[in-house]
């Protein structure tokens, strides 16, 4: 995504009130219950539902939009579908998603940016799933970009769509996370599922089109859920 300019940046997020933390735990429990219910009802007959993981960071636990986006995307990757298969299957895909989300911070970037990964790269080997992937030191969600807003400010024009998805929707949030996930994992051929797009608009569009092609049906279903 054009959203991945390689620059160094950091953000500190603090949570100062016990009441806020208590509310966050209730939020997480509520969303996990909703996701487990949807997974149970998604098939026919009796379905064994694996427990959803705890939020991978305090930020994901406390931020309602980010929390919901994480569990929406986790739910997509937990299913047996074209999207999860593209990422090597559910066990691998969900492990890397949770690791990615554990690194996320919120920053105020230029309005068209959705998510940005930058800095030192670490290679990770997850033994239980035999998954090898990479992580960037800095992973930023733009607090005034399409993940959270339709406009970056009251005086600016509407933030443009990414692919087929309107800004500040459940669909675009999952789309952004899945796009970034594609830059962290390799396919069976040894190449990154999505090559680094950096500042290349053409490559960014190609990468976005690939995610929409393989995950579009699952992303579309998010708009039908409450």
Please describe what each predicted stretch is:
Residues 1-10:
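Bacterial N-terminal signal peptides that target proteins for export
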Residues 23-174, 184-226:
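Predominantly extracellular/secreted Zn2+-dependent metalloproteases
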């Amino acid at each position: 995504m054009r959203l991945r300019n390689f620059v160094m940046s950091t953000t500190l997020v603090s949570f100062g009130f016990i009441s806020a933390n208590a509310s966050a735990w209730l939020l997480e429990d509520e969303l996990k219950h909703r996701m487990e219910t949807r997974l149970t009802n998604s098939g026919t007959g009796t379905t064994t539902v694996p427990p959803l993981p705890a939020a991978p960071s305090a930020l994901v636990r406390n931020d309602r939009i980010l929390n919901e986006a994480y569990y929406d995307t986790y739910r997509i990757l937990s299913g047996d579908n074209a999207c999860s298969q593209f990422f090597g299957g559910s066990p691998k895909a969900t492990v890397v998603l949770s690791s990615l989300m554990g690194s996320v911070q919120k920053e105020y970037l230029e309005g068209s940016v959705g998510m940005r990964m930058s800095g030192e790269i670490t290679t990770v080997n997850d033994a239980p799933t035999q998954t090898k992937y990479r992580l960037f030191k800095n992973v930023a969600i733009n607090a005034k970009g399409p993940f959270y807003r339709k406009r970056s400010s009251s005086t600016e024009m509407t933030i443009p769509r990414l692919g087929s998805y309107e800004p500040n929707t459940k669909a675009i949030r999952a789309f952004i996370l899945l796009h970034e996930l594609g830059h962290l994992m390799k396919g069976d051929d040894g190449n990154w599922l999505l090559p680094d797009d950096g500042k290349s608009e053409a490559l960014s569009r190609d990468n976005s089109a690939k995610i929409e092609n393989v995950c579009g049906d699952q992303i579309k279903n998010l708009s039908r859920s409450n």
